[in-house]
Swiss-Prot record:
Membrane-spanning intervals of the chain: none
Family: Belongs to the PqqD family.
A molecular function (GO) term: quinone binding
GN (gene name): pqqD
Keywords: PQQ biosynthesis
Subunit text: Monomer. Interacts with PqqE.
Pathway, per record: Cofactor biosynthesis; pyrroloquinoline quinone biosynthesis
Function: Functions as a PqqA binding protein and presents PqqA to PqqE, in the pyrroloquinoline quinone (PQQ) biosynthetic pathway.
Organism: Klebsiella pneumoniae
InterPro entries associated with the record: PQQD (IPR008792), PqqD_bac (IPR022479), PqqD_sf (IPR041881)
Protein name listed in UniProt: PqqA binding protein
Pfam family for this entry, one: PqqD
GO biological process: pyrroloquinoline quinone biosynthetic process
Length: 92
C-alpha cells in the first residue's frame, strides 16, 4: 500500500454506529467486527475517493497531539485490506 493508494469499502461492507455495541462496527454479509475509536476514526475517512495521504493528513490535523500517525494509519489500512473490509487501488 502506497500513500497514493485509494481505499474504499468492499461491496456489502459498511461502517456504522451500533448502539447495542456502543461502538462503531463494520457490517458485512457474514457478520460484523467491532472497532475501537482509532479504527473508526480512520475508516470514517474511507470514501473511495481519498488516497491514503489525504486520510493521514486529515487525521494528523484532527489529532495533532498524536505526533504523526502516518505509519499507524498505513499499518491499519493494510490489515483492513487483508481482512477484506476495504479495497486498495492505485489512481488511474
Amino acid at each position: 500500500m502506497q500513500k497514493t493508494s485509494i481505499v474504499a469499502f468492499r461491496r456489502g461492507y459498511r461502517l456504522q454506529w451500533e448502539a447495542a455495541q456502543e461502538s462503531h462496527v463494520i457490517l458485512y454479509p457474514e457478520g460484523m467486527a467491532k472497532l475501537n475509536e482509532t479504527a473508526a476514526a480512520i475508516l470514517e475517512l474511507v470514501d473511495g475517493r481519498r488516497d491514503v495521504a489525504a486520510i493521514i493528513a486529515m487525521l494528523n490535523e484532527r489529532f495533532p497531539e498524536a505526533g504523526g500517525v502516518d505509519d499507524d494509519v498505513i499499518e491499519f489500512l493494510q490489515i483492513a485490506c487483508q481482512q477484506k473490509w476495504i479495497t486498495c487501488r492505485e489512481p488511474e
